[in-house]
Amino acid sequence: MLISQGALCAKDYNASLFGIKSDGITLNTQSIQRAIDFISEKGGGKLKFYVGRYLTGSVQLKSNVSIELNEGAVLVGTPSIYDYVGANGMKALIVADGQQNIGVSGKGVIEG
């Protein structure tokens, strides 16, 4: 059996370890992106969100990184259009151009 090194190194990371707030008020875009970048640099893994409301603008998923929204977790898109990035007038909450082995899963909700 052949298992890739990335699969062996994949780890779960609690969003709160990166200073990501679940209060529904704090704009978490930079903290979430830093978490994704960190997990990517470590070879991949899953960023796990637990009960709460997580306000964010656009974040870019990277290869081998996934997001898990557990039951009661809500990823809330900020109402400000200026907090979103995109090309050619297209803006999105989660951007993943050219990335592999990514995903968003769980029983939580994406609002926005």
PLM segments and residue spans:
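Extracellular/periplasmic carbohydrate-active domains that bind, remodel
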Residues: 1-112
